[in-house]
Amino acid sequence: MEKNQQSTAEQYSEQIEQLMELGRTQGYLTFAEINDLLPEDAIDPEYYDKLLQTLQNDAGIPVLDEAPESDDMMLSDTIPDEDAVEEATQILSNVESEIGRTTDPVRMYMREMGTVDLLTREDEISIAKRIEGGIDEVQTSISAYPEALNGLLKNYDDVEKGNFRLTDLITGFVDPNAEIEEHNGLDEDFSDEDDEEESSNADVEDNEDEEDNESESTSDSSDSDNSIDPEVAREKFQQLREQHSKTLAVIEKHGRSGKRAQDQIALLGEIFKQFRLVPKQFDLLVLSMKEMMKRVRYQERQLQKILVDIAGMPKDDFEKIITTNGSNSEWVAKALKSSKPWAKRLIKYEDRIYEALNNLAITEENTKLTITQMRDICDAVARGEQKARRAKKEMVEANLRLVISIAKKYTNRGLQFLDLIQEGNIGLMKAVDKFEYRRGYKFSTYATWWIRQAITRSIADQARTIRIPVHMIETINKLNRISRQLLQEMGREATPEELAERMGMPEDKIRKVLKIAKEPISMETPIGDDDDSHLGDFIEDSTLELPLDSATAQSLKVATHEVLEGLTPREAKVLRMRFGIDMNTDHTLEEVGKQFDVTRERIRQIEAKALRKLRHPSRSETLRSFLDE
């Protein structure tokens, strides 16, 4: 039975590989080809949806109703990526057995993670070299367009002026001739420390976390700052600037295609390869090249729409014209005079054709590159970026287990396990970006700090119901650590005065930190063994009137009415209006006088007489009991 299942799985895997190979060769797949290659029992609706999604989104292979003409994909931006196709093949080989088995995201993540083999030291070096090679290809290709480096040099000018941090620009420099150092003994020490940490108790882990939190704000910057000598950076940037200026001058004088210009561009590329840019700066450079080519492709698609889709020009002819002429518009007149049937239909769109070609010419003028040169540079940048991205992905996927092992130590700290894994993976990706294999350490040794830093920072930033700034979290952790030390020394809880003296901080700030450190408690917290009562039931609602106050006010109202009944109707009404009894508001003497059609003085006299009557002991005794003693 097991052999049959294994044989079926192998057959299914082979069919998936055949399907992917066909899609990679053709650049597309049709629904008929998918149905023919896959066995009928494999086309489960849920799996079929996953198959189409993986083909189009992950592998970049479009799925069509019918086969297109041979040149349909000529100007398409979506080109199947060989590594993406291989990855999609692996996903599809696993997904059939996964569907219906479990929906737990953690188990699914663990299972997929387990399909990736661990790396040896040699594998790590090989992948790191591929990453470096891909980045070198990108930077060398960008050097062929020296104008792209203007922004980088301008940012360094801001660094010199103090308006920009050097660590926000570069992570360091690479010496291509440097040999790989050996630190095997130190790696073993690190491994021993990791084993000890895994077996340590929760208290030690808490202290570790607090120390990590305490230093995390400065560790990141210090780690980067110590690796970059400002004097070395100044020397390197000066060298880059001089070669950049020299290259532009030669291009301006002799043209970009000449041997002198190519030699200077090669020298510029060798210098620029030594720079390791931060990912944000690297992405900005790559994006600038992509945006440049995006404008060209847009105009070419406009021309294709007119010439091929509307006029009916054969695609072979269109591709030949665009490749040969670029922005040159001399071919338009010849095309309009052509005897071919599509030529007459072009006359109506002559202005739009010239407009698109003019836009291409403007792009060439702005960039000082021909369309062919732009395409060559951008293709080289894309190949290098793809190579580096694939290698980084391999390194990340092979070390996901390391993130899991570290994240397990930080459970029950306020974040869910999947959130801890996600934050740890972000730290892992940063470690891949900054890893320097020439220093001789294993990648796991280097990545552990970055993963812990990402996890502890996320706990400090997100775990609390009420967010507290990270610097305040550091102060709280330091205060807690010193409180435990004083408790061990004195055998009792330390007072705010003692904490302030030990920490060298004002006492009022210590009290403030102690107040902030308190965790909020839910009002739904159950009280007692049963769940009938909650904490909120025992908290006084200051917005409501107390029953005693309500009863007192009601009794006072009744007593006041009884006392007023002992006065004449006129006196009682005057007092009611003057003091707002049973009314929305009180009234002035003048307002009451108008009501009775008498003067203000007369109302004052009536009021005084009524109050004298109420002060008589026979009447005042009833109201005196309501006065607060």
From Swiss-Prot:
Disulfide bonds: none annotated. Its main location: cytoplasm. It is found in: Cytoplasm. It comes from the Bacteria. InterPro entries: RNA_pol_sigma-70_dom, RNA_pol_sigma70, RNA_pol_sigma70_r1_2, RNA_pol_sigma70_r2, RNA_pol_sigma70_r3, RNA_pol_sigma70_r4, RNA_pol_sigma_70_non-ess, RNA_pol_sigma_70_r1_1. Sigma factors are initiation factors that promote the attachment of RNA polymerase to specific initiation sites and are then released. This sigma factor is the primary sigma factor during exponential growth. This is RNA polymerase sigma factor RpoD. The gene is rpoD.
